[in-house]
Amino acid sequence: MRAWEEFLLLQEKEIGTNTVDKWLRSLKVLCFDACNLYLEAQDSFQITWFEEHIRHKVKSGLVNNNNKPIRVHVTSVDKAAPFYKEKQMQQEKTAYFTMHYGSVNPEMTFSNFLVTPENDLPFRVLQEFTKSPDENGGVTFNPIYLFGPEGSGKTHLMQSAISVLRESGGKILYVSSDLFTEHLVSAIRSGEMQKFRSFYRNIDALFIEDIEVFSGKSATQEEFFHTFNSLHSEGKLIVVSSSYAPVDLVAVEDRLISRFEWGVAIPIHPLVQEGLRSFLMRQVERLSIRIQETALDFLIYALSSNVKTLLHALNLLAKRVMYKKLSHQLLYEDDVKTLLKDVLEAAGSVRLTPLKIIRNVAQYYGVSQESILGRSQSREYVLPRQVAMYFCRQKLSLSYVRIGDVFSRDHSTVISSIRLIEQKIEENSHDIHMAIQDISKNLNSLHKSLEFFPSEEMII
């Protein structure tokens, strides 16, 4: 069929020959009439990939001789597996969909949350959210959409609310958007969609983080749309978090965005310097550490005001103080430097940073750092840029938003770039495999990430 073949040739230019051969040319053409094309996929996973990556292109790019759109229908006939393998898969499915409801940090409570002018509103709204209709006067915003940069306290507030709701016996589901997508793909592949829907819809409240990850995932958005509608129509509570306001979400359907705005969308801002110091002083008191304020200021500066990093460092400090029997001693800056020497070294000049990753990738490909960070779409620069983004995600565990800030790109571009590299790795692309291996070896030998703190077992 000529229209389909022309469409495939166009896709080869956009996403590469290997990808087209693996995912599209392997689709079997079953039947074609003037306005309908029927394809057979090798399995359900191939259908999911088609829906996520190609469906939107087909709608605008596949037309017949009369320039009318061709509707594409994709079905699959999965091959039967041997009995023992089928039984093993059945066990895996059972274990997978007897899913846990998401654990929370017991330290993340409303009482441990530092309320400041920057976060007073979301704090009060989430607290009201956990009360019964009798307690809050029957007024409940649903959904609640929290948005703000990494480290602003979204996770703390969500987990605080979850703990309160679970204490009252509620069935509260807490997932990331990545996990929702993984569950969906697994359900499609294993033919367990009914179990998936039952799990996600028979709950009292849904808390889902990082909704921007749904960007460009049409099949995932479709399923979440119906999940949202089902929960909302039954009066079940929904809390969504993101780094972006609803109107700023990229490649997310308008109907989903409108639903996020049905309740209340609340910005939450990171702590300013004074607020951060106050928050950490409370943690110091909780951990029974006696530390001079200037020593704490030094730690804040040395660890770049990163809240998660600072909390981890304080927990290590408390354990080391206890081990060395220094609980009653006031800690000065020199004491902190001694007790957290390894942590501070990891955060110092030897720690891995996005800039060092970019420098190493640039050296490997023989291009300049400026070209990787620039706007050129030449393949000579695009591939190194994508590889650098991939390493920022893999080595530093940076969020898509943070990587976007580094490379001056929106998060959807970052997500698609990283996925492209992951896909090439899965396809065993020789060039990519060698590049990832060599660059990774170089990064591992030269640096260690700020995230890789000494484990508690190593402190003595």
From Swiss-Prot:
InterPro entries: AAA+_ATPase, Chromosome_initiator_DnaA, Chromosome_initiator_DnaA-like, Chromosome_initiator_DnaA_CS, DnaA_C, DnaA_dom, DnaA_N_sf, P-loop_NTPase. ATP binds at residues 151, 153-155. The keyword Ligase does not apply. Residues 322-460 are annotated as: Domain IV, binds dsDNA. Residues 1-68 are annotated as: Domain I, interacts with DnaA modulators. Disulfide bonds: none annotated. It is found in: Cytoplasm. Residues 68-102 are annotated as: Domain II. Residues 103-321 are annotated as: Domain III, AAA+ region. GO terms for biological process: DNA replication initiation; regulation of DNA replication. One of its GO terms (cellular component) is cytoplasm. Oligomerizes as a right-handed, spiral filament on DNA at oriC. Belongs to the DnaA family. Plays an essential role in the initiation and regulation of chromosomal replication. ATP-DnaA binds to the origin of replication (oriC) to initiate formation of the DNA replication initiation complex once per cell cycle. Binds the DnaA box (a 9 base pair repeat at the origin) and separates the double-stranded (ds)DNA. Forms a right-handed helical filament on oriC DNA; dsDNA binds to the exterior of the filament while single-stranded (ss)DNA is stabiized in the filament's interior. This is Chromosomal replication initiator protein DnaA 1. It comes from Chlamydia pneumoniae (Chlamydophila pneumoniae). The gene is dnaA1.
